[in-house]
């Protein structure tokens, strides 16, 4: 048992899916996993372990932002021996050719967070995905008839930015989309020598102002989840 995860040794699989929303973790466990058992309810951040096509897989909610996901990733790796971490979540498109409900695979993650500046004594670090997981996810998506967008994303600390046009600078440099966790995930995976990948579904577009409803997100984001489960 760790501070924020109430699981016993052996309760968590070596591969863990990481939705930000704990209710999405519960939904995945109840609808896509066989023989799913809840191992964590601490702070309402549900965690489940079950089986997908015979493979043992866990799914653990992380909350929003780099500090929150960093807590769970640290504990999953150091206390429970997790080897593969796959974030599944939503993002906002920064490019006109990336539409709502598209799949984005994060090859790397730029960030406006200071967390790596602190860790690396003021220097920059380039948080990068596991190539092994990235290739598997890309190939599986194509096999499923999906053409994912692959590239650099932005991990931001600010959901409500004081400058609503600040995203345009990142877009100018080819950043595909914005979310709030991946730079933290990839950095910790590198620190501990494990594999990590982020697969995202576009929930809204900063370019066009389009957005999906909560109901649409629940229905249309299953492609992302199925890609993650297939490569688990």
Curated annotation (Swiss-Prot):
It comes from the Bacteria. The keyword Glycosyltransferase applies. Transmembrane segments: none annotated. A purine D-ribonucleoside binds at residues 4, 179-181, 203-204. Keywords: Glycosyltransferase, Transferase. Homohexamer; trimer of homodimers. This is Purine nucleoside phosphorylase DeoD-type. It comes from Caldanaerobacter subterraneus subsp. tengcongensis (strain DSM 15242 / JCM 11007 / NBRC 100824 / MB4) (Thermoanaerobacter tengcongensis). The lineage of its organism: Bacteria, Bacillati, Bacillota, Clostridia, Thermoanaerobacterales.
């Amino acid at each position: 048992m760790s501070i924020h995860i109430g699981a016993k040794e052996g309760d968590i699989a070596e591969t863990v899916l990481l939705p930000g929303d704990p209710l999405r973790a519960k939904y995945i466990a109840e609808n896509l996993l066989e023989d799913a058992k809840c191992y964590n309810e601490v702070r309402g951040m549900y965690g489940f372990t079950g089986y997908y096509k015979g493979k043992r897989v866990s799914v653990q909610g992380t909350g929003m932002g780099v500090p929150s996901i960093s807590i769970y990733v640290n504990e999953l790796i150091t206390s429970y021996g997790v080897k593969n971490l796959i974030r599944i979540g939503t993002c906002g498109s920064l490019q006109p050719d990336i539409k709502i409900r598209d799949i984005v695979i994060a090859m790397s993650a730029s960030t406006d967070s200071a967390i790596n500046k602190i860790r690396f004594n003021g220097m920059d670090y380039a948080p990068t995905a596991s190539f092994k997981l990235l290739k598997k996810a890309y190939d599986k998506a194509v096999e499923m008839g999906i053409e994912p967008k692959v590239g650099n994303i932005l991990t931001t600390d600010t959901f409500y930015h004081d400058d609503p046009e600040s995203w345009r600078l990142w877009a100018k440099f080819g950043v595909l989309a914005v979310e709030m966790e991946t730079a933290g995930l990839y950095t910790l995976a590198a620190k501990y020598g494990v594999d990590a990948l982020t697969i995202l579904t576009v929930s809204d577009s900063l370019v066009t102002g389009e957005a999906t409803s909560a109901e649409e997100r629940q229905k249309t984001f299953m492609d992302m989840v199925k890609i993650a489960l297939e490569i688990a």
